[in-house]
Amino acid sequence: MAKAHTNLKFIGGVNKDRIGGNCSVIEHTDEKGETNRIMFDLGSIFTPQESGFIAAYPNVDEYFDRINPTDGKRLKASKPVSALFLTHAHEDHIGALVNYTKMGYVLPPMKASGFTRNFVRLAFAKEGLKIPEIEKVKAGDVVKIGNNMEVEAVDVSHSVIDSLGFYTLTYAEDKPYAAIMNNGDFLTEEEMPVGKSFSREQYLDVFKRKAAPTTAVCLDSTSTTPVAKERIGFAKAVDNTYNEVMENTDRNLIVSPVISRSVQNIAIDIETARRLKTKVFLDGMWLQTVKDAMLLSGYNNFEDVVYKGTIQSYLNDKQIARKYVICSGAFAQGLEDYQNNVGYTATSPIAMSSAVKMAFDLHPYVKLGKNTLVLARQRIINEINGESGPKMLQMMARQGAKVVMTPGERSVGGFKEVQMQDSGHVNAKAMKELMAEVKAAVPNIIAIPIHGNPEQCEYTKDIMDKIGVATHLTANLESLNIGDGQVTNAEESHRPVSWYAFKTVYPNPYIDREVPLDGLTEYWEIDENYQPLQKVCEIQNTPRHSSPSRGSYNNCRKQIEQAENMPYREKMRRTDKGNNKMSKKVKNMKENLRYNLNKKKGRFGR
């Protein structure tokens, strides 16, 4: 009779230098030799801007079948997974799903909360992809995997609604063998304005009910630094936001760039608008998708405040004295695409978030000026928007807008800093309190810090050391044995960490290549230093985005150059002066663009 063993491996999420790309696999083999595997999350990581890639994803070649989009051949997975559990709808946890489907990967059956399920299904529909199989699960639901594994869903709190943790219990000889709690991203400190909040009682109960000889918990390490700010809470965040609006009564256009899926933070704008007795407009495709997913999931918390017409009618509505536009683009999506693709005179139709269009003065309806107050409530995070975020805000300020921002990892342009929202992740104090209670319930608990770079994971270890909780630090692709009362590194051949990354290519006079108007997405295999190894395939973009109907991309280049402290790449200085062939190509591109825009009038980017 074989010896049972439970193995945990992180395909992404414990990276060497930045947060994201979260993905883990639990594999269990019982004494009869039955093996089952399950996966948790499949997210994206924001790659450094200088890499030329937009984002990267964990390499799942071992776990998913793939149908090559070029020749149609099916490549079988060597270690197929039975199910994929999704903790929540943020990009660093689900961001690979659409792109891997485009690359030909066959996704396994998925399990997710109502909101996460609805959001993913809507996202696939907007990309013209087949709607994936996703089973809705809620706290307390138990999913059986084969004859030797089960997974129970647990409510947790985060900045996105309907977040779940998953408690996996494996069996050997019909008795519990090992348990692993995957919290996803979570916080414990306050009541959430929308949906369910973290329940200590429920959380501790699952550990007590389903005790195992070896129990491990994966801990979100994003905000466990000892110098992290104290949380101000939802009510204070609303107070601070409202006070800034009231201090600037001469500015009747309020613009708030947000992370579209962070519903708990969008609720700050919604409550501020209620106090102002005004309506908000949700501008951006993904914000509208989030609203639709909320309604499908039974959340109508914002409906009394959200304007029901078009943005044109909203801006022209004289009954609304102070306009409040909540827009996509807190991470300046699209600005990096512009820098990677467009030369001085190019007119490529690059998809841009609503906030970036405003910064470039390319938004068809919203024009910034001295009447505008920009509430940059999402803090600057160096690993995500450390370059593009400050550029976007400074470009907005150059148009006359006043910018107020939440303090982050860097100050920008001398803008006033006011704490207008909290991190969506548990801080050091709250984690220490929670894990002390977990240890009281499960004395042999072992912590595995994840969702952080090595320094952040060390901070979590320091917290655990203070309360006597054993900790095991790990890295991507290290195989961990969970059993015999401990977590140990398994002895197995180690392969180098690699990712699949994507970049977008748009029509550009500076490349000798014909590119469709909507552009191409190239998929590459890259190493852990974000250097390209090989090109995998390229896919034509869904014909949904188009260039703004007013303004010129030529002016965008000048705006970037003029804004303060804005480094830009040397390749972007080139012009077509003196090059008749290049000038002709640019002219032809402009004519083609005008023709296509007339055909697509009224359709704007994400």
Describe the predicted segments one by one.
Residues V160-S163, T170-A237, E336-N341, S348-V366, ...:
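Active-site-proximal loop/helix segments of hydrolase catalytic cores
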Residues H88-H93, H158, Q421-A428, H451:
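Histidine-centered active-site/metal-ligand motif
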Residues K229-R377, N382, P390-M392, A397-Q399, ...:
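Hard-cation-handling environments
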Residues H545-S552, C556, Q562, E570-K577, ...:
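Non-Sec secretion/translocation targeting segments of pathogen effectors
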Residues M103-G114, R121-G140, K144-E150, E173, ...:
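Non-globular, low-confidence helical/coil segments that flank catalytic cores
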Residues N7-I11, D17-R18, C537, T542-S549:
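Extended recognition/assembly regions associated with phosphoester-bond processing machinery
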Residues A2-A83, H90-R275, K279-G284, T289-Y307:
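His/Asp/Glu-rich metal-coordinating catalytic cores
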